[in-house]
Amino acid sequence: MYPATPALIARWSAPQYRSVVSTVIFIGQEAGLVAGTLLAGVLCEYGFAGGWPSVFYVFGVVGCVWSAAWYLLCSDSPATHPRITATERKYWETTIGTTDLVAHPPTPWRKILTSVPVLALTVAYFACSWGYLTLVICLPLYMHDILGVDIAKNGVFSALPFVLPIVIGPVSGLLADWLRSKLSTTVVRKLFCAVSFTLVACILILTGYVGCNRVLAVAVMCAITACCSVSFSTVLVNQLDLAPLHAGKIMGLTSTIADLGAVAAPHVVSAMTQHRSTRSEWQNVFFLLAAMYAISAVVYVVFGSGERQSWADDNNASRD
């Protein structure tokens, strides 16, 4: 889904609204995390088929229903949509230049893979994914082992940090689009990444010292995810800035590398928390995440860009 999303946004959203459109779409992931975490905790405790197996059955059915709706309702572009009027189609083609975006020029893979702004975005996306997935996957363990929260309540406590991003993400998108009318896109993207990652790094350091106070620990986790969601206006949108025609491919590249961090994160956390109930071990986990966010913020601020790249519209680009 990740590579498909920016490709569709490039065809269905005017450039001046892409920050808010992207954040609103991707924030569905946060809503799913909240609902899924709450429901999974309840199903594990009270569900059918022995409890935890019911989680897979319920989520599997939901996935099938959504897939059917996507297949029936989604179209590549306004030019190919069977249910919009001619007036609407003309509006989109005039506003976005949809006719040009329907074309499939050769992909300049060499230029993409050696593009400094793309590499800087990849570093930022990797850090964001690593940190976020560490919270998603390992937060229930932290809640259980350090804070002593039982499995039924664990779902509630683990879901709370992902509520604020549902609001903060779209608001940051609106603010980013407004600021783009005042400042350059490059400045806006770097500003949101730097502010977000710096705040997250600082709060992660503080998290190591909050002790076993459940309310304070959950409040700090909520602050982390809220600040992290501000970066969505950079890491989930910048592909469209750099090369709208190739945004899906760049998203595929950056998200694949970022997902390597998601795969590695649980193993790294497991290696660092072998005793699990030791607060000092979890403190080291938070310090590692803080360092990753700080370093990636510097990399993106120095090397990132919000401008369309010279190779983005090269119809004669080589496929190598």
Which residues does each PLM region occupy?
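Glycine-rich segments within core transmembrane alpha-helices of 12-TM secondary carriers
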Residues: 17-48, 60-63, 161-169, 254-267
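Intracellular juxtamembrane helix-capping segments at the cytosolic ends
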Residues: 1-13, 229-243
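Flexible cytoplasmic loops linking transmembrane helices in multi-pass membrane transporters
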Residues: 82-137, 181-191, 196, 320
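Extracytoplasmic gate region of multi-pass secondary transporters
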Residues: 110-172, 229-236, 240, 265-266
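Central mid-sequence intracellular linker of multi-pass
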Residues: 20, 24-25, 44-114, 295-320
